[in-house]
């Protein structure tokens, strides 16, 4: 019984961290969370003029990603990811903003050859987060 109590007390922080919005990587989240995956697929489905690495980001993780950060948008916690094309980070990058439950996503794409576009009809507050430092 004592061993079980020790195990549970040591494991509790790990369980608490599972739901954190910071420190996650985009491909891992898309691969493991159906709401996140479906939200991204919905944004990308049928879109033309996107870099191939962005169109394929759901099935292939061949891009460079920075760990997510939690941001507050209109008082609500959201998860912000940044990623770029391997070998072309200065020329082709994205920012993705997910609701805490992963069901809503907005995406900003910046590509030197193809230009920029924002998908998902972001609110003004969401757009300001996506376009910050651009």
Where are the model-predicted features located?
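Intrinsic-disorder/low-complexity peptide segments enriched for small residues
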Residues: 1-2, 8, 19, 129
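N-terminal signal peptide c-region/cleavage motif recognized by signal peptidases
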Residues: 9-13
